[in-house]
Amino acid sequence: KTLDVMKNVGYDKVLEEENVNFVDMNYGPYTELVLNHSIIKSTPINNILNEADVIISFTQLKMHEEATITASIKNIAMGWPPAEIHGYPKKKTGIHEDLHGFISSIMNQIPIDLSIVSCDKAMIGTGPTDGIPVDNDGLIIVGTDPVAVDTVGARFLGFLPQAVAYLYKLYNDGIGEAKIENIDLKGIDISKAEKIFSKNAYGKAVVLDNKNIKDIHGTQPK
C-alpha cells in the first residue's frame, strides 16, 4: 500500500521535514467522476481534484505490457482512481477489460497542467515490473500538453502515437497534440534525444524518423 511504500523509501521523513500535506488518492473523501467508458460508467476520485489549483504529473518513462507505455497520462489515469474501490492492483471492477478506453475516458475528465516524465531511470522490456532499467542522465520531457509529452516519450520507446491506443484516442478527442511536426520542441533536438535513449537502452543509436520527420502514421515526406 502507498504508505508502506512511502516508509520503505524514506519519503515519510521527507514529508515530515518539509511539512508537506500528503494525500493518499486510494481513499476519500470522494467526488464522483462520470466516465464515457464501455464498462465503468463512473468512479470515485479524491476531492483534491476539485481543490487543486494545478495538477502536475511526475513519473518515469516505462514500457507496459498492457498500456504500451507509462508516462504522464497513465500516471494520473491509473494512479488517481482509488484502490479502495478498484482493488490492489486495480483489477477488481473491470478497468483492465478495456484499459486503454479507461485511461482515455479518465483523461477526458481530468486536466494535467504540467507533465514531467523522467527518462533518467527509464524501463524497457516487461513493465511495469521485471523490466530492464535504462540510465539516461539528465534526460527529461516536460510540457503543458500531456499528449505531446507522452508522444515524445513513446517515440523514445520506438512507438508512434497510434501504437499507444489511449494516446491516439486522446489526440482524436482534441485533448492534445500528437503530430510531432506541430509540437513546439525546446531543448535538444528530438533525433539527438532519441539517439541518447536508444544507445543507452539497446547499445545502438536508433532514430525513429531516419532523416526526415515521419507524420503521425509513419509516412516520411518525399
Regions found by a protein language model. Name each.
Residues 1-222:
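N-terminal and secondary-structure boundary signal
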